[in-house]
Amino acid sequence: MTATPANVTLKDLNDQWAMNWKLCDDSEPMLVAQGVPWLVRKLLGLISMQVALKTVPDPATGLTHFFAEYKPPFGLPSSGEERVLDFVAEEITVPVFGTLRVSTRWATPKELDEIDAYLGEGFEKGTKEVIHMKTENSELGVVTHQTFGFEKIKGVRYHTRHIVVKRGGESTRLTLVYDYVGPQHAKKS
């Protein structure tokens, strides 16, 4: 268990984390709601994913670019995504989840209250904004909201994600918790 340093913020991310399964909520109900097949759910529950996150402000537009690279174990290929925090939806296809419309933005806890208060709860004191990602799977009628931020659990600062999955009249909520691995290193050319 490694705490995320206090100087690491969402505005200047360039760091890596590893999922802490002991502190995460059970992801099974979320994956069921998202239509993930049983075998894939079981496999996902056995691996510990690392994630590298980076935020880069664009001085020309004033918008922030958000990069996430997901690194599974055992030498499996990593996957990544880039989002502009402008809340403009773009269509992507993800093998496990199908075709999705994804939009990402900075959001205040008050803005998140309008969707579900869970999305903005629990983050460290003084949090003014978090990263909010919304994904829509129109084929399954599933809308997933997740927020990226930091919170203290038993006095230790972690990167966390609060997730709300809505399908029909049902909502599933969970928090994913990540241990700090360290800063990303520049790739050598």
From Swiss-Prot:
Superkingdom in the source lineage: Eukaryota
A molecular-function term among this protein's GO annotations: isomerase activity
EC number: 5.-.-.-
Pathway: Mycotoxin biosynthesis
Family: Belongs to the pericyclase pydY family.
Protein name as annotated: Probable pericyclase scpY
Purpose: Probable pericyclase; part of the gene scp cluster that mediates the biosynthesis of a hirsutellone-like compound that has still to be identified.
Top-level EC class as recorded in UniProt: isomerase
Keywords (A to Z) from UniProt: Isomerase, Virulence
